[in-house]
Amino acid sequence: SLSMPEARRRTGRKLSELDFNQPTQLYKDLSSLHPLLDYWKPLGRTMIVNSGAGGWFPPHKDQPMLTRDTFRVCAFISNNVTHDAYEWEMDGHRWPIKAGGVYYIDTRKTHRTHSWKDNSMHLVMNIPKTWENVVKLISATLNY
């Protein structure tokens, strides 16, 4: 996947998460993910992250402002995301992750990850922050 700073460097433009909204060949090839991806259609920048053993993201905040135009949902799509294989920390608290689980990520809070095993894969979706999508998120989490 292409980081936002790298995309901005390559294009010479100030891009937003919503500028990445065209389905790619990977989307077409991964038909098993269509029910989840299409639930939020249209999406902003969306990527699959495959963390190898030792892979990590340092503590950071992606967007500290309440006025951001997207929110983030992450789906853990491999088996190597259990507590002994993968660490997800948010605001100083380690969260237990379930394979197949889908989680809202509050990117205003400090978060970090660390993978202890190969093939810790997750789907990161930046979803337009519309009233309809916020209601979808709340409705989905009521059944959690």
Regions inferred by a protein language model and the residue ranges of each:
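Non-heme Fe(II)/2-oxoglutarate
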Residues: 1-39
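A short catalytic or substrate-binding loop motif that flags glycine-/basic-rich loops and adjacent residues
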Residues: 39-41, 65-69
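Conserved short histidine dyad/triad with adjacent acidic residue
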Residues: 47-67
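A short hydrophobic beta-strand segment most commonly corresponding to one strand
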Residues: 71-77, 102-104, 117-135
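A short beta-strand-loop-beta hairpin characteristic of the jelly-roll/cupin
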Residues: 76-98
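Conserved metal-binding segment of the jelly-roll/cupin
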Residues: 95-110
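Asparagine-centered strand-capping/turn motif at beta-strand->loop junctions
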Residues: 111-116
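Active-site or metal-binding loop neighborhoods of secreted/extracellular toxin and effector enzymes
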Residues: 135-144
